[in-house]
Curated annotation (Swiss-Prot):
Family stated for the protein in its record: Belongs to the GcvP family.
Domain of life: Bacteria
Key words of the record: Oxidoreductase, Pyridoxal phosphate
Species of the source: Paraburkholderia phytofirmans (strain DSM 17436 / LMG 22146 / PsJN)
Job description of the protein: The glycine cleavage system catalyzes the degradation of glycine. The P protein binds the alpha-amino group of glycine through its pyridoxal phosphate cofactor; CO(2) is released and the remaining methylamine moiety is then transferred to the lipoamide cofactor of the H protein.
EC class of the enzyme, as a word: oxidoreductase
Reactions catalysed, as given in the entry: N(6)-[(R)-lipoyl]-L-lysyl-[glycine-cleavage complex H protein] + glycine + H(+) = N(6)-[(R)-S(8)-aminomethyldihydrolipoyl]-L-lysyl-[glycine-cleavage complex H protein] + CO2
Keyword Oxidoreductase included in the entry's annotation: yes
Gene3D superfamilies hit by this protein: Aspartate Aminotransferase, domain 1 (3.90.1150.10), Type I PLP-dependent aspartate aminotransferase-like (Major domain) (3.40.640.10)
Name of the protein in question: Glycine dehydrogenase (decarboxylating)
Keyword Oxidoreductase listed: yes
Length: 978
């Protein structure tokens, strides 16, 4: 609804209240071009209306004819109305004091980090740092994360985060399979590993032929296993000395991975010092809200010889063109976007934002602060253990860091009931045992309450007093950690962890890092296949509400009513958008959604007695996660050719489907295609695969071009994953978090993922858990709920149409300068377009990399480089960018083309030109010694508009080859920056 100007309204009969109430104002803030701008853009394209454009772009055979069936969310809510509605749901949650533990702990987020990282768009709207020159701030923060992990685990090298502890353990298993015993397929898991980790490891193991054996750790050396997983400390609290066991496992030819509690490692001997080959774990308790299970940043650290087998992102140190230190993503040839089905993992999005928060928690507290927190946690646990013993309880684990398990016998239910009455959650271990874990937030008052609960269940009013217990422990000098396992080595000695402890210094450090980066708060990020749209403030606000942030994933169901209602509503919203029958929100990244979808397809075939179907057809243009996920799901990848127009080659598809008809499991297609086109024959593709016994997996990476206009579940898809961090407004966070829901047809709903260990069993024949928590990254789901609630059906469709309009406008304006490689009928594209720079390289020597780096001088993040076609740029402007910003990008691209023409016609040197030396730092431009044939002004201010709005890249072009040849993935000395 658009209101007329108030001055004009004053001269008329007053409008009714209903006419003055604005419910869809948010849509006007989310969608960039206003009506006048859209009219001008449509006119440039030769269309009278947006509807006419959409009719020309999307095949009529797949058009959605009905309005999105969003039920109570069909009509948009205002920002205030949506927040109020979500607040009603949040208030149905009950925030108890949680001592459940089991890998999830309450933690204090330092407010300086809360406000200046988690709530700061300079951090949360950034993209994965593939363009290092404009990503130095978050790369430094992630390097700090790696240094923190290396120091605390005692291992040589760490990655820059994984999705959660459970999936990190699964990644470690497959890593050890690649490097381990060639004749063994056994992976041994100690029975005191976190239950959710065991479940995810089993899910991952089955498709690739790994046998998981679970038993007492003492049996590991004789299991003939290629790898062994140990928990340190164990789930029930035991702190065990595994030195001798590790030596025995190594002697038997196996390797050891240790799931280690990061806070405990500040006081316990790190795994790397007692022989572990790999360490994994969760960094959640380093200042990240528990959030009903996520998102949190996991870690994985290895011995040096395993570094090239690591999954996930790895930040390394290199030099720039001037020889100064620079950071970049290292060893990318391990990853899915290059290695495809041979990659070390299918991980694309990880948990960068949460890793940055955890690293800044370590920077803020420093080694002394962290150890103080750990010692306080341990002390409170020891005081509770002593008090419970005085009340007649038996402690099942005499050694502990923060977790206690009590033999409670007949008192079990009474103890749990007494705790519930005080709004306290304990962990029911069994009918005769109760466990609990102390955390950073536990206070003296909380300890007194816990002692009172234990006393009540023991039917006594004689509650042990905290001060008396403290004095007794001090006098006895008893230790809960074996002396042999007390940490003696130093950690976090680098200056970054020892100089930013005042809030002033911390604030300025965070600001200095964010100033180095280009994020959506500065300019558009036109990355194809990434959908870098607005992450609105109203969508983000609920993430930090305690009613969402302070709920344990294994809390009793009666305490999570609001969460589950919100999740149910969001699932129904996504069902409406996709045209499928059911959705699971458990996968905590798009890669995990893909993987879950393929496991569901396998389970479906197996239920029909066709478990032998294992061939997955994948078009040559597919995203790298597709073949990597297929390999992880135990499938054989068969590539289907694309024709000259970039579409799936129908004849080759028929041939491959026929050749593999007896074993065909699925095809994975992306729609619109990764070439940015709505393929006209998508229904035929689906029919061919179905006719040969396969299922159709439609990758939802490009769902932003479909919402409200077409639906994969209606044109032949059987299963899809979505990217809520693309289409539905969860921010990219500099490389995560993400959410990758899996959506399925009615015949596949019974196979959606469960999590038996936590009692989450939604599907009768569900696959095993694919994430550590039942609902994955639950605490960021309100972002997508808010987006859909504020947009409503009509405006969601309008957003899709505008995304297509913006892409076609950019393509039209740039086509005279850069050929648009693929298009549909009428020369139109979907929501993105591919600019072909290969002819430019032939005529000028200028590469796609040169253009990408030069864009930084113009204040823009480069589009997606060399995907899906080498030597191209893929541009996706999204619906959120205004015509003004689109024109600014178009102007920059045309100006760069003129710079290239100057090289082509000899006005500029082929080597000494502003593209070859881009990006230009301020230090380079103001240096006394300027040796280039072009002017300083050309380097720094190629357009007059940049004078008022200039972004300076902090480093020159990063040397990728040097960085990989001289791999260094820890914090560099401060002298290197001086």
């Amino acid at each position: 609804m658009k209101l007329e100007h108030p001055d004009r309204l004053m001269n008329r009969t007053p409008l009714s209240l209903a006419a003055l109430e604005v419910h869809d104002a948010f849509a006007e803030r989310h969608i960039g071009p206003d009506a006048a701008d859209q009219h001008a853009m449509l006119e440039a394209l030769g269309f009278a209306s947006r509807a006419a454009l959409i009719d020309a772009v999307i095949p009529k055979t797949i058009r959605r004819t009905e309005t999105l069936p969003l039920g109570p969310f069909t009509q948009p809510k205002s920002e205030a109305e949506a927040l109020a509605a979500l607040r009603e749901l949040a208030d149905k949650n009950q925030v108890f004091r949680s001592y459940i533990g089991q890998g999830y702990y309450n933690a204090h987020t330092p407010t300086v980090i809360l406000r200046n990282v988690l709530e700061n768009p300079a951090w949360y709207t950034a993209y994965t740092p593939y363009q290092p020159e404009i990503s130095q701030g978050r790369l430094e923060a992630l390097l700090n994360f790696q240094q923190m992990i290396v120091d605390l685990t005692g291992l040589a090298i760490s990655n820059a985060s994984l999705l959660d502890e459970a999936t990190a353990a699964a990644e470690a298993m497959t890593l050890l399979q690649r490097v381990g015993k060639p004749k063994s397929n056994v992976f041994f898991v100690a029975d005191d590993v976190l239950p959710q980790t065991i479940e995810v490891v089993r899910t991952r193991a089955t498709p690739v032929g790994i046998e998981v054996k679970v038993g007492p750790a003492s049996e590991a050396a004789n299991a003939n296993a290629f790898g062994v997983l140990l928990q340190y400390p164990g789930v029930n609290g035991d702190v065990r000395d595994y030195r001798a066991l590790t030596e025995a496992i190594h002697a038997a030819g196996g390797h050891v991975v240790v799931a280690a509690d990061l806070l405990a490692l500040t006081v316990l001997t790190p795994p790397g010092e007692w022989g572990a080959d790999v360490a994994v774990g969760n960094t959640q308790r380093f200042g990240v809200p528990v959030g009903f299970g996520g998102p949190h940043a996991a870690y994985l650290a290895v011995r040096d010889e395993f570094k090239r087998q690591m999954p996930g992102r790895l930040v390394g140190v290199t030099v720039d063109a001037q020889g100064n230190p620079a950071l970049r993503l290292a060893l990318q040839t391990r990853e899915q976007h290059i290695r495809r089905e041979k990659a070390t993992s299918n991980v694309c999005t990880a948990q960068a934002l949460l890793a940055i928060m955890a690293s800044m928690y370590a920077v803020y507290h420093g080694p002394h602060g962290l150890k103080t927190i750990a010692l306080r946690v341990n002390r409170i646990a020891a005081l509770l253990a002593e008090g419970a013993k005085q009340l007649g309880y038996t402690l099942a684990n005499e050694t502990f860091f923060d977790t206690l398990t009590f033999d409670t016998g007949a008192r079990t239910q009474a103890l749990l009931d007494a705790a519930t009455a005080k709004r306290i959650n304990l962990r029911r271990v069994s009918a005769t045992q109760v466990g609990l874990s102390i955390d950073e937030t536990t206070t003296r008052h909380d300890l007194a309450d816990l002692l009172a609960v234990f006393a009540q269940a023991a039917f006594t009013n004689d509650v042990p007093q905290v001060d008396a217990l403290d004095a007794k422990l001090a006098a006895s000098n008893t230790a809960s950690v074996p002396a042999a396992l007390e940490r003696t080595s130093a950690y976090l000695t680098h200056h970054v962890f020892n100089r930013h402890h005042s809030e002033t210094e911390m604030l300025r450090y965070l600001r200095s890092l964010s100033d180095k980066d280009l994020a959506l708060d500065r300019s558009m990020i036109p990355l194809g296949s990434c959908t870098m749209k607005l992450n609105a403030t109203s969508e983000m606000l609920p993430v930090t509400w305690p009613e969402f942030g302070q709920i344990h994933p294994f809390a009793p169901a009666e305490q999570t009513v609001g969460y589950r209602e919100m999740i149910d509503q969001l699932e129904e919203m996504l069902v409406a958008a996709t045209g499928y029958a059911a959705v699971s929100l458990q996968p905590n990244a798009g890669s995990q959604g893909e993987y879950a979808g393929l496991l569901i397809i396998h389970a479906y075939h197996a239920s029909r007695g066709e478990a032998h179907r294992n061939v997955c057809l994948i078009p040559a243009s597919a995203h790298g996660t597709n073949p990597a996920s297929a390999q992880m799901a135990g499938m054989q990848v068969v590539v289907v050719a694309c024709d000259a127009q970039g579409n799936v080659d129908i004849e080759d598809l028929k041939k491959k489907a026929g050749q593999h008809a007896d074993k065909l499991a699925a095809i994975m297609i992306t729609y619109p295609s990764t070439h940015g086109v709505f393929e006209q024959n998508v229904r035929e593709i689906c029919e061919i695969v179905h006719a040969h016994g396969g299922q159709v997996y439609v990758d939802g990476a490009n769902m932003n071009a479909m919402v409200g206009l077409t639906a994969p579940g209606q044109f032949g898809g059987d299963v899809s994953h979505l990217n809520l961090h693309k289409t539905f407004c969860i921010p990219h966070g500099g490389g995560g978090p993400g959410v990758g829901p899996v959506a399925v047809g009615a015949h596949l709903a019974q196979f959606l993922p469960n999590q038996i260990s936590s009692g989450y069993e939604r599907a009768p024949n569900g696959i095993g858990a694919v994430s550590g928590a039942p609902y994955g990254s639950a605490s960021i789901l309100p972002i997508s709920w808010m987006y859909i609630a504020m947009m409503g059906a009509k405006n969601l469709t309008a957003a899709t149409e505008t995304a297509i309009l913006n892409a076609n406008y950019v393509a039209k304006k740039l086509a005279p300068h850069y050929p648009v490689l693929y298009s549909g009928p009428g020369g139109l594209v979907a929501h993105e377009c591919i600019l072909d720079l290969r002819p430019i390289k032939e005529t000028s020597g200028i590469t796609v990399d040169d253009v990408a780096k030069r864009l930084a001088d113009y204040g823009f993040h480069a589009p997606t480089m060399s995907f899906p076609v080498p030597g191209t740029l893929m541009v996706e402007p999204t619906e959120s960018e205004s015509k003004e910003e689109l024109d600014r990008f178009i102007e920059a691209m045309i100006a760069i083309r003129e710079e290239i023409r100057a090289v082509e016609d000899g006005r500029s040197d082929r080597e000494d030109n502003p593209l070859k030396h881009a990006p230009h730092t301020a230090a380079v431009v103001i240096a006394n010694d300027w040796k280039h044939a072009y002017a300083r002004e050309t380097a720094a201010y190629p357009l007059p508009t940049l004078i008022a709005k200039k972004y300076w890249p902090p480093v020159g072009r990063a040397d990728n080859v040097y960085g990989d040849r001289n791999l260094f993935c820890s914090c560099v000395p401060i002298a290197d920056y001086e």
